Amino acid sequence: MAKELTREMLWEAGAQFGHQTKRWNPKMKPYIYGEKNKIHIIDLQQTLWRLEDVKKLMANIAARKGKILFVGTKKQAKWIVKDAAERCESFYVNQRWLGGTLTNLKTIHLRVKRLWNIERQEKNGELKLLPKKEQMLIKKEKDKLEKFLGGIKGMKELPQALFVVDPKEEHIAVREARKLRIPVIAICDTNVDPVPIDYIIPANDDTSRSIAIITHHIADLYGDAMGIKMPEPQFKPSEFTRRDGDENRNSRGGQYDNRRMSGRNERGRDTHYSHKAPNSGKEEAPVGTEPVATTSAPSFNFNTINVVDNDLEKTLSKLKVDELEILSEGFALPKAKKAEMVSELSKHLTIVDNKIVKK
């Protein structure tokens, strides 16, 4: 059952922090409580009221046996969106939004069918009969399709609602949903235009803790309405002790700007980036600040690891912390939190023939 959110929980997650006052959108004024040190403070009571509206929407969607599409392509939102969608048996997009994902669903289905065909060939052993070069090309094609379409390969019809972490970042997805009259739920920061959004959730959309607590709450509301027995989040919001905003909060152009670091410090935010979420792409996630071990590490038998759904990150996440530490030492990686170790090990390992091997 969905745990009731309180203002204290949202405050602890840093959901109240908006953008600098000079970067606000005046249309967000009704959701702003005030300002401090030239930073807007979001009214968290408004956030709670808006979540109650979303709860009613979830009941309506559940009555129609509909699904939700979760969208979040920002670094700090990718893994959260995937985890939340999988928990409530819905769909997600956590890589670049492909134009026409909603408005041209038939074409997207053709690419999904291609992905299914490759998976069927792998399962039947047909790929092993092909030349090695062709096998490699098909494997690359499969990885690319899985990366962009893996979260929606079971979506046979349009979703009943679209949940977006940052509507400014995901404006194409919002525009497609509006065109098809699909209700849009979105976490709206103080720099967002709320007009295209049907269900506004005013909150900080740049920190992992804020994104996680709201996204998982939306998943819980949907799961409760559908009567789904949901597992616990793979990485809980409470695991994040640092309020790590990304470059997007300091620079609208997406590039890091040291001249604007003062704004982050005025919020009381830590400027370190050592606690990042795991990601399956090529983006590198910073690791902890502990010194790298130089001693030889004990060997680890990869054959003892049970591969889950041919997914490296999911497989590593099932391991115990001490097992991850042994693996990390084998690559001269520092001991860190579980999420960090999973992220770093994913850069050094891969899955071949349903077995984990070194790259």
Swiss-Prot record:
GO cellular component labels: cytosolic small ribosomal subunit
CDD domains: RPS2
Record's compositionally biased regions (Basic and acidic residues): 239-250, 257-273
Domain of life from the UniProt record: Bacteria
GO BP of this protein: translation
Gene3D superfamilies noted in UniProt: Glucose-6-phosphate isomerase like protein, domain 1, Helix hairpin bin
GO molecular function, one term: structural constituent of ribosome
Region of interest: Disordered: 232-295
Family annotation (InterPro entries): Ribosomal_uS2 (IPR001865), Ribosomal_uS2_bac/mit/plastid (IPR005706), Ribosomal_uS2_CS (IPR018130), Ribosomal_uS2_flav_dom_sf (IPR023591)
SUPFAM superfamilies listed in its UniProt record: Ribosomal protein S2
PROSITE patterns: RIBOSOMAL_S2_2 (PS00963)
Keyword Coiled coil listed: no
Any matching Pfam family: Ribosomal_S2
Keywords: Ribonucleoprotein, Ribosomal protein
Classification via HAMAP family: Ribosomal_uS2_B (MF_00291_B)
PANTHER family, alphabetized: 30S RIBOSOMAL PROTEIN S2 PROKARYOTIC AND ORGANELLAR (PTHR12534), SMALL RIBOSOMAL SUBUNIT PROTEIN US2M (PTHR12534:SF0)
Family named by the database record: Belongs to the universal ribosomal protein uS2 family.
Full protein name: Small ribosomal subunit protein uS2
Species for this entry: Spiroplasma citri
Protein's gene: rpsB
